[in-house]
Curated annotation (Swiss-Prot):
EC numbers on record: 3.6.5.-
Family annotation (Pfam families): DUF1967, GTP1_OBG, MMR_HSR1
Species per Swiss-Prot/TrEMBL record: Bifidobacterium adolescentis (strain ATCC 15703 / DSM 20083 / NCTC 11814 / E194a)
Domain of life, per lineage: Bacteria
Record has Nucleotide-binding as a keyword: yes
Residues annotated to bind Mg(2+): S182, T202
One GO-annotated biological process of the protein: ribosome biogenesis
Record protein name field: GTPase Obg
Keyword annotations of the record: Cytoplasm, GTP-binding, Hydrolase, Magnesium, Metal-binding, Nucleotide-binding
Length: 563
């Protein structure tokens, strides 16, 4: 089995964000110290990186499922959770990332192109990690001073992608099976491709680095083509994707073939027809030269056979009439290889300069609109507010007469994933956010009535509930005692001296009030003393005397008063 794999389907998932913490600060002499729950850590992302040391996608065939590390949950004392580590996956230079399309459980086919990793070190974030949930310390504000909940971490992005390897080479060797392409790449470079005397020996592309003086260039040996390959004959056009990145196409023609109906000119025309069929299906990268416009070079091989050399000399003028450069070589005797090497080096130098010029012109012609730098807190403000374009509400109905309202939008779907539905206060916070965004108003506009089913989100992550716009905003104890609005600690509203620190003005006022009260008591006692109430017991025992200390209609403890 070959260890070369140039197309795989990979399932990637970013790490989940950690949950926020709903901690309460506990400190001596501070019974109402407030919330101190930290935020959850963000999940790690899955990143493809072009690596010059990688040459195949074989690892992803046997391990197609890759997942990044999740973030940890927040802790008390406003300690944020740690961020999950990013998962960096090395891929060969020239790898193209496509979105995988197709029904679940069946083979996928490439969809939209997501990235083209053409240079070593290029990176693409294929699955972003989820954001960590906010702790209750971050949720506290002027009106919600003691949140009893925190937000959950968001799940990481999850998707299927297709990786296609398109070899980066300067020269592509194309030709019929057994034309000598593998022998040529082995003779000009240090590559060791499989060589045998039967067709379709080469089943995978081979790359070789050729040295011409101080210059180096790469040649690619593409598996053999036959007429009708565009309709699936032979190996089809499966491996022709490897010539998309090559700037020079070299036709290797077998001049010693004995197959009936074949000659060098007919072989060239047949291959050009297949290339034209394939070129019409391509979407070339920025600055690339279309395949029909790329320079061709004709290599007449196997001239070590006498009849083949005569045929090569005969057809050479015919190719030159078409404006093509022709080289007569033999991979067995190495005849003409040195001249071919220098000719390819000069052609590669010119094409590299041409491609660089095209890319620069394309970049200058592109209009890049850069958004203004947003303030630091813009994201949080946008997360709370919104406009009518942030979501959509549609009325849905199935064949059974079941009716529901579907709410879709980035913010509502994110908020649903962040909500802990086991916490009534968190559910109420979600209701407040949706109402502030305008979801309730839009539901009324669409004709929704209390009790109608509402679904927020798509697929398995959708949340269903019965809409009740009149739900109470405050939480309740088990006995029905109202606790107040969400996030409001009623203890903070009490005038308890232990919960409030007096100002200096209040201390002075209370001190003067206390001293005035004591002075009034002393003056009253002094007046009673001067009136003789303390010296005459009969006056003190008079229950009709309103000015005495023991009067006011009270009966003596030792005996009844005589009438």
């Amino acid at each position: 089995m070959s260890d070369f794999v140039d197309r795989v389907t990979v399932h990637v998932k970013g790490g989940d964000g950690g949950n926020g913490s709903a901690g309460i600060r506990r400190e001596k002499y501070k019974p109402l110290a407030g919330p101190n729950g930290g935020n959850g850590g963000d999940g790690g992302s899955v990143i493809f990186m072009a690596d010059s040391n990688a040459n195949s996608l074989l690892d992803y065939r046997f391990m197609p499922h890759r997942e990044a590390e999740s973030g940890t949950m927040g802790l008390g004392d406003t300690k944020d959770g740690s961020k999950g580590a990013d998962l960096i996956l090395p891929v060969p230079v020239g790898t193209v990332v496509f979105e995988a399309k197709g029904p679940q459980g069946k083979p996928k086919h490439p969809g939209e192109q997501l990235a083209d990793l053409r240079h070593a070190g290029d990176k693409f974030v294929v699955a972003a990690g989820g954001n960590g949930g906010l702790g209750n310390a971050a949720l506290a504000n002027r009106t919600r001073r003691a949140p009893g909940f925190a937000l959950l971490g968001e799940p990481g992005e999850e998707r299927d992608v297709i990786l296609e390897l398109k070899s980066i080479a300067d020269v592509a060797l194309v030709g019929f099976p057994s034309a000598g392409k593998s022998s040529l790449i082995a003779a000009m470079s240090s590559a060791k491709p499989k060589i045998a005397d039967y067709p379709f020996t080469t089943l995978v592309p081979n790359l070789g680095v050729v040295v011409a003086g101080d210059m180096r260039y790469t040649i690619a040996d593409v598996p053999g083509l036959i007429p009708g390959a565009s309709q699936g004959k032979g190996l089809g056009l499966e491996f022709l994707r490897h010539i998309e990145r090559t700037e020079i196409i070299a036709h290797v023609i077998d001049c010693a073939t004995l197959e009936p109906g074949r000659d060098p000119m007919s072989d060239y025309q047949a291959l050009e027809h297949e290339l034209a069929e394939y070129a019409g299906k391509l979407e070339l990268p920025l600055g690339a030269i279309p395949i029909p416009e790329r320079p061709r070079i004709i290599i007449l091989n196997k001239v070590d056979v006498p009849e083949a050399k005569e045929l090569a000399e005969f057809v050479k003028p015919e190719f030159e009439k078409l404006g093509l450069k022709v080289h007569i070589i033999s991979t067995a005797s190495h005849e003409g290889l040195k001249e071919l090497n220098w000719a390819l080096a000069d052609l590669v130098t010119n094409m590299r300069a041409e491609v660089a010029k095209r890319e620069q012109a394309e970049e200058e012609a592109r209009v890049v609109i850069k958004p203004l730098e947003e303030p630091r807190n813009r994201r949080r403000r946008n997360d709370e507010g919104g406009n009518a374009l942030d979501f959509t509400v549609e009325r849905k109905e199935n064949g059974n007469g079941e009716v529901w309202y579907e709410v879709l939008g980035t913010k509502p779907e994110r908020w649903v994933m962040q909500t802990n539905f086991d916490n009534d206060e968190a559910v109420g916070y979600l209701a407040d956010r949706l109402a502030k965004l305008g979801v309730e108003d839009e539901l009324r506009h669409k004709g929704a009535k209390p009790g109608d089913e509402v679904r927020i989100g798509r697929g398995d992550r959708a949340v269903e509930f019965d809409w009740d716009p009149t739900i109470a905003a405050g939480a309740e104890m088990l006995d029905g005692t109202q606790l107040g609005a969400r996030g409001v600690d009623l203890r903070l509203q009490e005038s308890d001296g232990r919960a409030q620190r007096r100002s200096n003005t209040e201390r002075r006022r209370q001190y003067h009030e206390m001293m005035d009260a004591r002075q009034a008591v002393r003056e009253a006692m002094m007046a009673e003393r001067k009136a003789g109430h303390w010296a005459d017991p009969s006056v003190d025992d008079d229950r009709h005397d309103e000015t005495s200390l023991f009067g006011r209609g009270e009966t003596a403890d030792d005996e009844d008063v005589e009438q």
